[in-house]
């Protein structure tokens, strides 16, 4: 355990080493949802299609337990529709440029972390076109990203026209299932008849008919990096860096991050849910609710200098006075604290240590912040 108020601790990072930062991208640093925006603007009934397939992806991973489907699987399920309706590389790249909107303070926070010796990695479910473009703006090299690779134009060449016709024929039928809320049930036997019918329709399409078509290669190639695949990426990065998970600051905001957040939390690393939804908050030890990213490097610096016990103390007693004390004992740089004290930051930023007792309240507050910061479809994503 860490003795609070000290810079010496038995856990945390080794002397001279800074915590390694492994973070989701959409949510903690950028506000749009690139794939959802592509679907909404480029596909007929795109918003409904996205909702339907998001619900179905969670049904496959959490109810039907299909091993090949992880949280975030929507990006694989929507791929046949994007190909059918002639969405191309140019469309994905143009939307990446349009969606390059960073949360306030994000670029400064990332720059600070990298300048002060933190190894910064992005692990995102998003398509590579978006992650590579926006990460480059933030000064993060392509090699330090792990995301969903979607070579859309090479995949398009392999798809037969009669298989595209199949997708066109069932587009309305799939979009209609959005109202069935497949993601609201925990067990197959709990599905009401109308919801079960929607599930069977989608199962027949994605687990049978498309698997027997030229789209099989598409479904096999587009493997969204979410859930267990994010955790696998975290393990890979730790091996590459020769670091322990207890030296990691892992940041996420959604169900796609629950595995890597949960394992980090269980191993006494810093697991931050930044404006997270319920699955993220449930698997984090710290929930951040903020319109500004300055709080993230602040927490990472305290964690690196004094360990997870000091983070618990600070976030259970969150206030400018508590943080000022961290400056006085050498756990926090005065300049970073001064940036936090700027009125629009301190007034609107909170960090809370997540416990069983405060879980429901924290989730409610965090989800509200999430919808306000990300807005629209992105704010409501699971």
Predicted regions and their residues:
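C-terminal cap/substrate-recognition subdomain and adjoining C-terminal extension
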Residues: 4-6, 104, 108, 116, ...
């Amino acid at each position: 355990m860490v003795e609070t108020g000290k810079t010496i601790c038995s856990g945390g990072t080794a002397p001279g080493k800074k915590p390694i930062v492994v973070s989701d991208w959409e949510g903690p640093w950028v506000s749009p949802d690139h794939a959802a925006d592509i679907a909404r603007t480029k596909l007929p009934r795109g918003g409904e299609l996205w909702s339907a397939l998001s619900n179905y992806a969670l049904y496959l991973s959490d109810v039907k337990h299909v091993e090949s489907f992880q949280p975030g699987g929507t990006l694989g399920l929507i791929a046949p529709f994007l190909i059918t309706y002639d969405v191309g590389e140019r469309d994905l790249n143009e939307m990446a440029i349009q969606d390059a909107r960073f949360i306030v303070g994000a670029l400064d926070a990332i720059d600070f972390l990298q300048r002060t010796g933190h190894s910064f990695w992005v692990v995102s479910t998003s398509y590579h076109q978006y992650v590579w473009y926006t990460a480059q703006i933030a000064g993060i090299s392509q090699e330090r990203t792990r995301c969903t690779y979607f070579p859309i134009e090479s995949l398009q060449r392999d798809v037969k026209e009669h298989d595209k016709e199949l997708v066109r024929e069932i587009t309305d039928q799939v979009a209609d299932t959005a109202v069935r809320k497949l993601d609201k049930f925990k067990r197959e036997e709990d599905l009401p008849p109308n919801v079960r019918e929607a599930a069977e329709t989608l199962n027949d399409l994605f687990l049978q008919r498309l698997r027997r078509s030229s789209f099989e290669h598409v479904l096999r190639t587009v493997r969204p990096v979410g859930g267990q695949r994010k955790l696998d990426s975290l393990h890979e990065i730790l091996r590459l860096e020769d670091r322990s998970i207890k030296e990691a600051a892992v940041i996420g905001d959604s169900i796609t991050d629950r595995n890597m957040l949960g394992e980090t939390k269980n191993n006494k690393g810093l697991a931050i849910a930044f404006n997270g939804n319920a699955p993220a908050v449930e698997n984090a030890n710290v929930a951040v609710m903020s319109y500004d990213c300055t709080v993230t490097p602040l927490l990472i610096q305290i964690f690196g200098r004094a360990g997870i016990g000091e983070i618990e103390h600070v976030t259970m007693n969150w206030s400018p006075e508590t943080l000022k004390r961290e400056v006085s004992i050498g756990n926090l740089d005065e300049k970073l604290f001064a940036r936090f004290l700027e009125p629009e930051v301190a007034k609107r930023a909170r960090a809370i240590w997540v416990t069983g007792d405060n879980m429901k309240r924290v989730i409610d507050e965090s989800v509200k912040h999430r919808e306000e910061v990300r807005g629209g479809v992105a704010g409501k994503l699971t």
